[in-house]
Amino acid sequence: MRVAGLIRVVVFIFTIVTMWVFLRSYTSFSRKTIRLPRWLGITPKDIQTPKSKCGLSKICPNNFFAFKISSGAANVVGPSMCFEDEIIMSPVRNNVGRGLNVALVNGSTGQVMKKDSFDMYSGDPQLLLNFLTEIPDSTLVLVASYDDPGTKMNDKIKTLFSNLGSSYAKQLGFRDSWVFVGAKDLKSKSPYEQFLKNNPETNKYDGWPELLELEGCVPRKVM
């Protein structure tokens, strides 16, 4: 009986020790992070998911600028512009207004050169005409409408926007929605443009079409 009892004790102790070793090994493994081989020359903290600028759905290639533009919503929410991950115009920055909001960016460096808003309902259209006439070469032009961009729009202004690459400037009218990125002396029409006509049958808001959003990657210097 003593031998049998001793065997039971030994088996019991062996079982306890085995379980303890197993549990210790398991919990130790679960706390470890999977490490890459040293010969790769990198550690896990070096692996980071690249973040797109301006919240774009993709990362822009080298020598491209990231941008995102939203038109205003009716006459309630103002437009916003993001360029290279910087909000350059928005209601929060308190630098947008009714009509057309325009920002000029150096097409080579990406530096914001000038920005302003122009009241196209009761303001002086000559101010916008002067602004557009003085745009230097190799300049990117970002435009977002708010409330009413077209009442004071004249043929000279429409022609200047068309020369910047717009396909819809000549159609712009009362309370239309418009977002656009063009460039000085562009040889062809810009691919970065959206336009919605004010139409009571299709308007999303009472008296205004839906707001528009435009995002993408624009190449340096030449579009």
Curated annotation (Swiss-Prot):
InterPro entries given in the database record: FAM3 (IPR039220), ILEI/PANDER_dom (IPR039477), ILEI_FAM3C (IPR039475)
Recorded superkingdom: Eukaryota
Keywords attached to this entry: Disulfide bond, Glycoprotein, Lectin, Secreted, Signal
Alphabetical list of CDD domains matching this protein: ILEI_FAM3C (cd13940)
The keyword Nucleotidyltransferase belongs to this UniProt entry's keyword annotation: no
Residues carrying sugar: 106
Biological processes, Gene Ontology terms: aorta development; negative regulation of insulin secretion; neutrophil homeostasis; neutrophil migration; positive regulation of macrophage antigen processing and presentation; signal transduction
Disulfide cysteine pairs (residue numbers): 54-82, 60-217
Primary site of residence: secreted
GO molecular function: carbohydrate binding
PROSITE patterns: GG_LECTIN
Signal peptide: 1-25
Pfam families: ILEI (PF15711)
This protein's GO CC annotations: extracellular space
Segments forming domain GG-type lectin: 62-221
Family: Belongs to the FAM3 family.
Protein name: Protein FAM3D
Organism: Mus musculus (Mouse)
Lineage, uppermost ranks: Eukaryota, Metazoa, Chordata, Craniata, Vertebrata
